[in-house]
Design a protein with these regions (language model features):
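Bacterial N-terminal signal peptides
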Residues: 8-18
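Cysteine/selenocysteine-centered motifs that mediate thiol-based redox chemistry or coordinate metal-sulfur cofactors
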Residues: 186-197
């Protein structure tokens, strides 16, 4: 009987310990799971929001936005110091040329003439590298990461295709694709801001 009581006590302690452990929350979008946090450049980042990019009735990709501090303001997110990460999981095959043209077009639509003058050389170099990287297939994970004093890196399934583009202004320009005044998808913008999850 004493042994049974001892085991009951041990199991009770273990159960309370397990329940006290922090849960790793996951947000799911179209079957894609985004972790609640990640580490980039040695700094923890939080999932600000995740959502679905649609074109007409087609599901194109799921996207998660990771920042140092959650916020519902696009300008506050873009101006937060520290690393940031955009994670895109493709839900269909995407032609490299069309994807690149869409990204460049969305940057242009959300940037002033003066901003484009400063961005053009870096944007053209990024576009050239993206086109050379080949088509992205369904299930591919594209990461667009920014680390201060290092720059913007774009990878496809862990393979770097755009390496260390300098300037935080460049990453802000990419963020404006989804968070700018003329976002690629208004519904996705709300989801990334945590306003429609």
């Amino acid at each position: 009987m004493k042994v049974l009581k001892a085991w009951t006590l041990v199991l009770g302690v273990m159960l309370s310990w397990v329940m006290a452990m922090p849960a790793h929350a996951v947000q799911e979008v179209a079957g894609v799971k985004f972790q609640d946090s990640l580490v980039l450049g040695g700094q923890p980042l939080q999932l600000n929001g995740a959502g679905l990019r649609r074109m007409m009735i087609l599901k194109v990709y799921a996207l998660g936005l990771y920042v140092p501090r959650r916020d519902a303001s696009p300008s506050a997110i873009m101006n937060q110091p520290g690393p940031k990460s955009i994670q895109i999981v493709l839900l269909r095959d995407v032609d490299a040329g069309r994807l690149t043209d869409a990204l460049v077009g969305d940057v242009e639509a959300n940037s002033s003439d003066a901003e484009m003058l400063a961005l053009r050389g870096r944007l053209d170099a990024m576009a050239s590298n993206l086109r050379k990287s080949g088509d992205a297939v369904e299930g591919s994970v594209v990461r667009i990461d920014y680390v201060p004093n290092q720059g913007t890196t774009i990878s496809n399934n862990g393979k770097v295709v755009v390496h260390d583009v300098p300037g935080e202004d460049f990453y802000r320009a990419l963020l404006r694709i989804w968070l700018g005044e003329h976002p690629a998808d208004k519904s996705l913008k709300k989801q990334l801001l945590g306003l429609d999850n």
